Amino acid sequence: MKTIAGFSAAAILCAAGASFAQDYPTKPIRVIVPLTPGSGADIAGRIVAKHLSDALKQPVLVENRPGAGGVIGTQALLNADADGYTLMVQSASHAANPAIYKTLPYDPLKDIVDVALLGMTPYVMIAARGGAYPTLKALIDAAKAKPGQIPFASAGVGSSTHMAAEYVAQVAGIKILNIPYKGSPEAIQDTIAGRTAFYMAPINTAIGLVSEGRLAPLGISSRRRSEVLPAAVPLAEQGFPAYDVTLWFGMWAPAGTPPAVVQRLNAQVASVLKNREVVEQFGKLGIGPQSMAPEEFGRFVRSEITTYQRIVKQAAIPQQ
């Protein structure tokens, strides 16, 4: 009798969840972006939110909650009800944070549900045009001559731009000095001024700066050249075949969000990413739309967490 009762209770819960998902959403959805306005995650999140709103017939409102590498915004997500009406769009920093912080106020594998991958984009190593390092070789030679003294800009300790630069150092066998800034704008300004040797900028940030002649591309992190910035030669073609790094963006929900809602969101996001307008908007920014089922995305996130832990350990980056 207990077994039958337990089975019946489970069946009722499943039916209730399916019914909830079928009616979902019945009110506006909030999407937290734990990074600054204008960041890659913010831009990608807003593009997806607009078209997701059209698909779901409900407003999808983006709210920026930057700070502490995304930790503050992530906490805001976890303080919300797990009902599918509060989501988060974040970058690869989500996977780097467990390696950067000694203790996080949440468990990224247990407290957060992986909903969907949105897209991937390469980094561009940009330096002051006409500056001290006109080529990648010149930069690496200088770093070998002065270990740990050549400064590079990052959008904060543990940011994806920091990790991408540290990985350059590891594959090139050099030591460089991280100069962390509050965000990308400040990092770019000092790179333009020549106060830092380079900045690993997401390609959507680099496109305008390079076309305006304010910065020069020393290389791109992907194995292939980008159509939107063909002047950037892959690091893999400049003597570092192992270097292949991309910045990615994803969507998450609080743990406890009904699985049927997660599946519905994933399916809708996958559909949005095939929309011609979205493909064109992403393409102009150098972002490749890419979708994964929730389970596959979860495996991807776990592998990225492991990768960042290795980078942090090898670079001996002090935990915050």
Question: Language model features by range: what are they?
Answer:
Residues 94-103, 169-171, 198-232:
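A ligand-binding cleft/hinge motif common to bilobed small-molecule-binding domains
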